[in-house]
Amino acid sequence: MIDPDGFRPNVGIILTNDAGQVLWARRINQDAWQFPQGGINPDETPEDALYRELNEEVGLERDDVEILACTRGWLRYRLPQRLVRTHSQPLCIGQKQKWFLLRLVSNEQRVRMDLTGKPEFDGWRWVSYWYPLGQVVTFKREVYRRALKELAPRLLTRD
């Protein structure tokens, strides 16, 4: 599902542990790291997509996490021209994302990257909250900055 402006609705997932670190995942067979994210199907709410993607990409269930916050609006990034599939219709020029800040309430041993036939990640680690800003691919950096900045107060004020 792509909106009239060419952006695909998507959810981004910032999963934290009790130390305030975030789960940082390595794309399969690449030296590229990112937060889990994924598209929102036409029949899903952003929260529905969050739980589906959380399970598909990191093997966690609804009961394994607590939602701490969500960005108020959509955060958008454009794909570099080399990644735009110009021959597909409708044309997708980027993603518009709702970002969720989650806290892991179960054991981290439950994190699994291999539950689907086509895993997106082959490794993960805990990193400091702001670490991803200096590591993510350039075209996603501003969205990461905005999401982390908006959601940070909720992490710092949680009970």
Curated annotation (Swiss-Prot):
CDD domains: NUDIX_Ap4A_hydrolase_plant_like. Keywords: Hydrolase. It is an enzyme of class 3 (hydrolase). A motif (Nudix box) lies at residues 38-59. Transmembrane segments: none annotated. Gene3D superfamilies: Nucleoside Triphosphate Pyrophosphohydrolase. GO terms for biological process: mRNA catabolic process. Its cofactor is a divalent metal cation. SUPFAM superfamilies: Nudix. This is RNA pyrophosphohydrolase. It comes from Pseudomonas putida (strain ATCC 47054 / DSM 6125 / CFBP 8728 / NCIMB 11950 / KT2440).
